[in-house]
Amino acid sequence: MSQKSSWPELVGVLATLAATQIGKDRPDVAVEVLPPGAPLTPDFNDKRVRVFMDDNGIVFKIPVIAK
């Protein structure tokens, strides 16, 4: 069975809840919750999921592994 690598269903959800769900689905990856304008490193990391939130703390981009 393949492991989950993206969470389109979390767009529109509070970022804190999204991070919790990703952690439950994939405890082997680190979850980074990023506010608008946060600096990003361009490195590829297959053990990371970035959760991009808007000014209201809502996920606005599909969280995916390694992006």
Regions found by a protein language model. Give the residues of each.
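Exposed, flexible binding/inhibitory loops of compact, secreted disulfide-stabilized domains
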Residues: 1-67
